């Protein structure tokens, strides 16, 4: 009787399936990374230094966010309160059309959610304004 020889067991790792698994993991991380970064909550630090803004002695247009959906705007020293989002966009566009070098500042109360300040910035962006300053109080 002839003895059959068995194939020797390979003790080395098979690279192809290993690379397949690694590539799938990389794809999963690439797909989930943008989702994770969009859901990060931010705690902003207090302002230790603030810089004064001057615009050739022009009075800036100040958009104040007093609460959720509560906006007030100061144009040339005249304050208008209780504005809707459409009114804010319209008034901002009118001031920007008069002089495209007008300085726009956005200020929010401490208790206003960060999302509302972003909405105010988006309203100014819809009005065609590309440069906006944020108001802070020095500590």
Swiss-Prot record:
Any one GO cellular component localisation term in the record: plasma membrane
Residues that span the membrane, as ranges: 15-35
Bilayer topology annotation: Single-pass membrane protein
Pfam families per UniProt: ExbD
Any GO MF annotation of the entry: transmembrane transporter activity
KW Transmembrane (keyword) present: yes
Compartments in which it is found: Cell inner membrane
Entry keyword set: Cell cycle, Cell division, Cell inner membrane, Cell membrane, Membrane, Transmembrane, Transmembrane helix
Top-level lineage group: Bacteria
InterPro entries: ExbD, Tol-Pal_TolR
The keyword Repeat is annotated on this UniProt entry: no
GO biological process terms on file: cell division; protein transport
Family, per entry: Belongs to the ExbD/TolR family.
Cited PANTHER family: EXBD MEMBRANE COMPONENT OF PMF-DRIVEN MACROMOLECULE IMPORT SYSTEM (PTHR30558), TOL-PAL SYSTEM PROTEIN TOLR (PTHR30558:SF7)
Annotated function: Part of the Tol-Pal system, which plays a role in outer membrane invagination during cell division and is important for maintaining outer membrane integrity.
Subunit structure of this chain's protein: The Tol-Pal system is composed of five core proteins: the inner membrane proteins TolA, TolQ and TolR, the periplasmic protein TolB and the outer membrane protein Pal. They form a network linking the inner and outer membranes and the peptidoglycan layer.
Official protein name in the record: Tol-Pal system protein TolR
Organism whose genome encodes this protein: Haemophilus influenzae (strain ATCC 51907 / DSM 11121 / KW20 / Rd)
């Amino acid at each position: 009787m002839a003895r059959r020889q068995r194939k020797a067991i390979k003790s080395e790792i098979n690279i192809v399936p290993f690379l397949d698994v690694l590539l799938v993991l990389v794809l999963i991380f690439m797909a989930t990374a943008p989702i994770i970064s969009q859901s990060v909550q931010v705690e902003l630090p207090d302002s230790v230094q603030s810089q004064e803004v001057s615009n050739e002695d022009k009075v800036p247009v100040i958009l104040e966010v007093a609460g959720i959906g509560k906006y007030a705007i100061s144009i040339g020293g005249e304050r208008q309160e209780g504005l809707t989002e459409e009114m804010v966009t319209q008034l901002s566009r009118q001031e920007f059309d008069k002089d495209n070098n007008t300085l726009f500042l956005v200020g929010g109360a401490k208790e206003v959610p960060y999302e509302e300040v972003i909405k105010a910035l988006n309203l100014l962006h819809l009005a065609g304004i590309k440069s906006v300053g944020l108001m802070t109080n020095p500590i």
